[in-house]
């Protein structure tokens, strides 16, 4: 495999090279790269997230506050909600963790770097990506869960303790899951879930202490939790993880959408009389046959041509929501 041109990420994970990272770690094995925090200055726009004050000065969007302080305020209804940037510092002092989602909206240099990094990581062009800044104080953190995204975490201030545990229940998950939800599992996740979940404190986890200047590559699906008893600040670069299923479905949709029958309005099968149900079943069988024929003629080239599709409508919607809110003053 040909080597990848040296990059900002490569300079941070050194002595691991970008080629070694792609071959030995990406996309399933975590990597901890330690060094001085000054090396993060190679990240474009880093000076705008160097301190919590820097972040609050540029972030013109609602801030997610998370943790026990929120649970207490809401009388147990929720552990998180959105507040204005003006209120965020007050919640921070109460012990809530702050999440500045889509921080890259306010730092064009970071946005451009993320797009370049997406290409270096060989991700499809339509992959969702963003920067998130996390700030926590007085024991703030997140309980055990796994993500459907992958993260590059750059610890800027303070020390944060991470628990990392191999996921024996699912591989390549396509949705986020909080361990506190067990034994409830969403239908899609249930279809490929195996065994019993781990205990909530992840007793068999590896303990990783992130100190200023440490970078953690966190693959999707890895069980993890975080905790800090001091003020911490970290920059997360988050990438979606489009599966071959996503690309194939997008390519198949492009083939089928030209057929008017597939664009017809669907009906509620339960609302029909038996004779109509039988007639509809026959009609759907003909559509299934057409679908099968199109799937059989699907080519790798057609699949590759779908790489710029929108694989994450939720994140796309969130981005539009955040963009609209940037015009408001708090």
From Swiss-Prot:
Per UniProt, the cofactor note for this protein states: Binds 1 Fe(2+) ion per subunit.
Name the domain of life this protein comes from: Bacteria
Any GO molecular function: metal ion binding
Chain residues that bind Fe cation? 145, 147, 224
Names of required cofactors: Fe(2+)
Q: Which is one Pfam family of this protein?
A: JmjC_2
- For the keyword Chloroplast, the answer is no
Q: List residues traversing the bilayer.
A: none
Location of the JmjC domain: 96-256
Q: Could you list the residue ranges forming a coiled coil in this record?
A: none
- What UniProt keywords are attached to this protein's entry? Iron, Metal-binding
Q: What family does this chain come from, according to its entry?
A: Belongs to the ROX family.
Q: What is this protein called?
A: Uncharacterized protein YxbC
Per the record, the gene is yxbC
């Amino acid at each position: 495999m040909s080597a990848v041109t040296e990059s900002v990420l490569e300079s941070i994970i050194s002595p691991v090279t970008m080629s070694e990272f792609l071959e030995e770690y990406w996309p399933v094995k975590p990597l901890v790269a330690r060094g001085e925090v000054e090396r993060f200055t190679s990240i474009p726009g880093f000076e705008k997230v160097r301190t919590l004050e820097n972040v609050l000065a540029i972030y013109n969007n609602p801030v997610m506050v998370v943790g026990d302080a929120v649970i207490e305020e809401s009388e147990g209804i929720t552990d998180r909600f959105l507040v204005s940037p003006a209120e965020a510092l007050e919640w921070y002092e109460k012990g809530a963790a702050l999440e500045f989602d889509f921080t890259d909206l306010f730092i064009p240099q970071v946005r451009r770097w993320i797009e370049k990094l997406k290409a270096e990581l060989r991700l499809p062009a339509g992959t969702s990506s963003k920067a998130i800044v996390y700030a926590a104080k007085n024991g703030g953190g997140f309980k055990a869960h796994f993500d459907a995204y992958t993260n590059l975490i750059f610890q800027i201030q303070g020390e944060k303790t991470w628990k990392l545990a191999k996921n024996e229940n699912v591989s390549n998950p396509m949705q986020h899951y909080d361990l506190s939800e067990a034994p409830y599992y969403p239908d899609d996740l249930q279809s490929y879930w195996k065994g019993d979940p781990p205990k909530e404190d992840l007793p068999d986890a590896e303990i990783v202490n992130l100190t200023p200047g440490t970078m953690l590559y966190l693959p999707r699906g890895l069980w993890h939790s975080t905790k800090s008893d001091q003020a911490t600040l970290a920059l997360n670069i988050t990438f979606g993880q489009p599966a071959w299923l996503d690309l194939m479905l997008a390519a198949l949709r492009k083939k089928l959408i030209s057929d008017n029958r597939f664009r017809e309005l669907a009906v509620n099968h339960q609302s029909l009389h038996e004779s109509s149900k039988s007639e509809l079943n026959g009609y759907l069988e003909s559509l299934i046959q057409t679908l099968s024929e199109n799937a059989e003629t699907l080519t790798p080239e057609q699949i590759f041509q779908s790489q710029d599709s929108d694989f994450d409508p939720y994140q796309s919607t969130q981005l539009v929501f955040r963009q609209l809110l940037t015009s408001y003053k708090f």
